[in-house]
């Protein structure tokens, strides 16, 4: 059985959309077209957006990560674009129960001089969620340049040091791009030299997640053979993350006892330390011809975790569904 409805929280002026496919339930919001909840068989899998990090699954557009000095040069003019772009902080237009669009406007053009439409859609089928991004260059004459990526955070008590990420294939040639942690204009940028990714992996497949795993920010992998990774928490695979349409996989969490891990599919990267600041020179920048579209997606397959919390969460979901239906009646 598949159905959907809208819940209006008037006191917060935020509209949420809930989609249900048998045992998998997701909630999204128009602000950032962001996921706010993923429940499978009554258990929450998405970070709550409260402790340590106030986001949950932001869209990275039209840049991924940091720009050198926080700005870039496009067609001879300097533009300031915030870390991970501006889309995650803008309100999208809802165009369907599970679809949103952000269109270029005066605010976006002041930061990014391209005309575009960014579509975000969520599809659920059985125990799998697919997140789809479609970018359309709406200009008739000019090629559009942009980067894009995802940043979902999944519940995982990695600080207990019982968690790991397993690559689907043996990774013989995988590389890691270190994040530069030296204070100054190059802070948070990609280092020019890569590291053998095998130094991070056990038996060519296992990335053990420890308390100090993210002391140097994200672990950014490139030249990945696997199409998917598994997130294992306390001896159980909780999800399978498929990102084969992207060039990089960033893995990150906040320092401390943060109860989540982010799996970040990136098409492009932050600026490198030796960046020229020219947007057109960014590594793997997407060049989209006039009136053309670029579609890219990733998917998450969820596995049932039976221990603890399920009954309460299912009752809570049933109450939420009842409230939503009552609101619709009025």
Model-identified regions with their sequence ranges:
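Extended, loop-rich substrate-binding clefts of extracytoplasmic carbohydrate-active enzymes
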Residues: 77-126
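Cleavable N-terminal signal peptides of Sec/SRP-targeted secreted and luminal proteins
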Residues: 2-16, 316-329
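Active-site/ligand-binding surface loops and adjacent short beta/alpha elements
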Residues: 153-156, 160-243
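Short, well-ordered beta-strand segments enriched in hydrophobic/aromatic residues
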Residues: 26-28, 120-122, 129-137
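C-terminal GPI-anchoring signal of eukaryotic secretory precursors
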Residues: 304-318
């Amino acid at each position: 059985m598949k159905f959907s409805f809208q819940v209006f929280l008037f006191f917060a002026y935020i509209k949420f959309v809930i989609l249900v496919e048998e045992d998998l339930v997701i909630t999204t919001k128009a602000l950032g077209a962001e996921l706010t909840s993923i429940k499978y068989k009554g258990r929450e899998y998405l970070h709550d957006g409260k402790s340590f990090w106030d986001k949950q699954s932001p869209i990275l557009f039209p840049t991924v990560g940091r720009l050198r000095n926080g700005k870039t040069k496009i067609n001879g003019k300097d533009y300031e674009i915030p870390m991970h772009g501006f889309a995650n902080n803008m309100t999208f237009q809802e165009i369907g129960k599970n679809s949103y669009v952000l269109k270029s406007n005066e605010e976006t053009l002041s930061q990014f001089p391209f005309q575009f439409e960014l579509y975000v859609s969520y599809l659920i089928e059985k125990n799998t969620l697919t997140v789809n991004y479609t970018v359309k260059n709406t200009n008739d004459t000019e090629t559009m340049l942009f980067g894009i990526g995802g940043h979902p955070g999944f519940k995982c008590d990695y600080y207990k040091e019982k968690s790991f990420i397993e690559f689907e294939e043996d990774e013989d040639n995988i590389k890691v791009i270190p994040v530069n942690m030296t204070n100054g204009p190059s802070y948070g940028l990609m280092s020019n030299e890569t590291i053998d990714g095998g130094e991070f992996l056990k038996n060519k497949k296992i990335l053990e997640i420890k308390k100090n795993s993210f002391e140097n920010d994200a672990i950014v992998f490139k030249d990945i053979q696997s199409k998917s990774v598994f997130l294992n928490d306390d001896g159980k695979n909780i999800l399978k993350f498929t990102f084969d349409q992207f060039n990089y996989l960033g893995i990150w969490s906040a320092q401390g006892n943060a109860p989540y891990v982010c799996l970040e599919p990136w098409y492009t990267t932050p600026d490198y330390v030796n960046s020229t600041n020219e947007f057109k020179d960014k590594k793997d920048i997407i060049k989209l011809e006039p009136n053309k579209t670029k579609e890219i997606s990733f998917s998450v397959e969820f596995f049932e975790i039976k221990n603890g919390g399920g009954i309460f969460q299912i009752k809570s979901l049933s109450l939420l569904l009842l409230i939503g239906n009552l609101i619709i009646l009025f």
